Amino acid sequence: MITGLALSRVAFGLTAFLLLAVVSSQEKCSNTCIAQNCNSLGIRYGKYCGIGYFGCPGEPPCDDLDACCMTHDNCVDLKGMTYVNCHKQFKRCVNKLSKSIKHSNGEKIGFSTQCPYSIVIPTVFNGMDYGIFFSGIGNIFNPPVLGSVPVVEVDLARSKVDTKDGLGTKLGLQTKEGSKVSASLNI
């Protein structure tokens, strides 16, 4: 049973998260690779990693982790912040990158020496756990609506994501022009 104090803490956390997302989302897109606040929820890494931080359309990611963030941003833009599969796909992408780093014997590094993968990856991974938690709460209050059929087209050349499950949609992707894919995104 959820007590009044626990419920108010959850409500406060959700409010703070949403407020931070709204305030941060009013910023301009990034076309520069940056590394700030590497070990906090206020992280900004590459062009695409961080709450409310996003790259300008057509901007290539700074490294493989930034490519995972770019793919996540594209999914959230289309499906909404409460679509949990976007967050789960991001975690799979980061897990795959982590395994690749371990097998590279230290040769695979991110673009920033100030924010090495050893600090950035756990930070964004833990932040995504919060995203999954708050998405679940958001879906209680605002369940997805069936109906519209948006289509996404993304160049996945650098993202290294697993597209077998349709980026979390369970729909097949149509490949065209090399690494460009498109899919109908039914909820």
UniProtKB/Swiss-Prot annotation:
Q: Which GO terms describe its cellular component?
A: endoplasmic reticulum; extracellular region; Golgi apparatus
Q: Name one GO molecular function term.
A: metal ion binding
EC number annotated for this UniProt entry: 3.1.1.4
The listed locations are:
Secreted; Golgi apparatus, trans-Golgi network; Endoplasmic reticulum
Reactions listed under catalytic activity: a 1,2-diacyl-sn-glycero-3-phosphocholine + H2O = a 1-acyl-sn-glycero-3-phosphocholine + a fatty acid + H(+)
Q: In which tissues is it expressed?
A: Strongly expressed in mature flowers but weakly expressed in other tissues. Detected in buds, open flowers and in pollen.
Its primary localisation, in coarse terms, equals: secreted
Instruction: Identify the residues that bind Ca(2+).
Output: 48, 50, 53, 73
Q: Which cysteines are joined by disulfide bonds?
A: 29-56, 33-62, 38-115, 49-69, 68-93, 75-86
CC cofactor note: Binds 1 Ca(2+) ion per subunit.
Alphabetized PROSITE patterns for the sequence? PA2_HIS
Active-site residues?
72
Cofactors named for this entry: Ca(2+)
Functional note = PA2 catalyzes the calcium-dependent hydrolysis of the 2-acyl groups in 3-sn-phosphoglycerides. Releases lysophospholipids (LPLs) and free fatty acids (FFAs) from membrane phospholipids in response to hormones and other external stimuli. Plays a role in pollen development and germination and tube growth.
Q: What else is known?
A: The enzyme has a slight preference for phosphatidylethanolamine over phosphatidylcholine.
Record-given protein name: Phospholipase A2-gamma
Q: Which organism is it from?
A: Arabidopsis thaliana (Mouse-ear cress)
